[in-house]
Amino acid sequence: MSSPPPDGLGVRRATVDDAPAIDELITAADVAVQGWSESSVPELLGWWRMMDLEHSSWVLHDEESILAYAAGFAHGDNFELDGFVHPDHQGRGLGAWLLARGEDRAGELRKPRLQTFSLAADDRAHRLFEQFGMRQLRRYYRMMIELEEAPLPARLPDGLELETFDPGEAKAFHDALIEAFEDEWNFVAMPFDQWRELRLVQDPDFDPTLWFVVRDGEEIAAVMRNEPDRSGAGFVGALGVRKPWRKRGIALALLQHAFGEFYRRGKRRVALGVDAENPTGATRLYERAGMQVAFEAVAYGKELR
């Protein structure tokens, strides 16, 4: 924290105990831009499990409350920073100070690129990023569907079988997931041991009955990882089909199966995130399944060397 914060504010690292207050900050920032937020304490804690808060987080505060916050993590060649300023305290240079700290941390980790995100509707954030020398890289959609009635049963192509995930086959699931996503923009494969610890051990919401595998004989053709609840909605965390099995309706069948399972559990809304320029045409698939764009986010990046 080499540079003092603006206006004599205090600065410290985030801790798990800060989660409720920081969630309130994020919610206020989202609501100011788009009128609603899907932030929650469990989701925030999930992100923090991937971060080194002791070295890669910053909390700006006065004597009464947290005014701004950012945290990040190394992701391939990027240092990815996620930051928020309370709408009542914008225009004080807090966001620029946090970006500078993210750039400093990227240098410490020898990462050649700083990357961050904002809601597509947040013009103030876009101006800040551009003034900081960043450029727009990619757009992402949060897509949702409201389930007004029980979905029709999913139908897979002949010869394929849908199974519930067996934690004893986690390595095969992980391998199939990596292969399915290897061509995605900004994708970095997480080592299996780290992935297993994060998803199967540390995650309090891990529910193997919401993870699915499509098999073609002994081969895994597709995998799906779902979360039981994110801000009141069932959430599709990952859906991947290996290349030899694409264009056969498997992804749509998996999605419909997940819709049905969420509906059976009382969830009437299902959401997911997707790269708007996904090379496999996932956005069109989700639209065919009845999903619509709820909001857009934008990725910005800055080359540091």
Task: Locate the predicted segments by residue.
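Acyl-donor-binding surface of acyltransferase catalytic domains
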Residues: 1-5, 73-80, 85-160, 298-302
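Phosphate-binding active sites in nucleotide-utilizing proteins
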Residues: 182-243, 251-252
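Short amphipathic alpha-helix that is part of the acyltransferase structural core
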Residues: 1-45, 155-190
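Conserved acetyl-CoA-binding loop-helix of GNAT-fold acetyltransferases
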Residues: 91-104, 238-241, 247-264, 283-288
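Generic hydrophobic alpha-helical scaffold/packing signal
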Residues: 177, 211-215, 224-227, 237, ...
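Short loop/turn microsegments at loop-to-beta-strand junctions
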Residues: 10, 54-56, 208-210
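Conserved donor-binding loop and adjoining core beta-sheet/short helix segment
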Residues: 16-19, 24-109, 115-120, 216-217, ...
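Active-site/acyl-donor-binding loops of N-acyltransferases
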Residues: 130-151, 256, 265-305
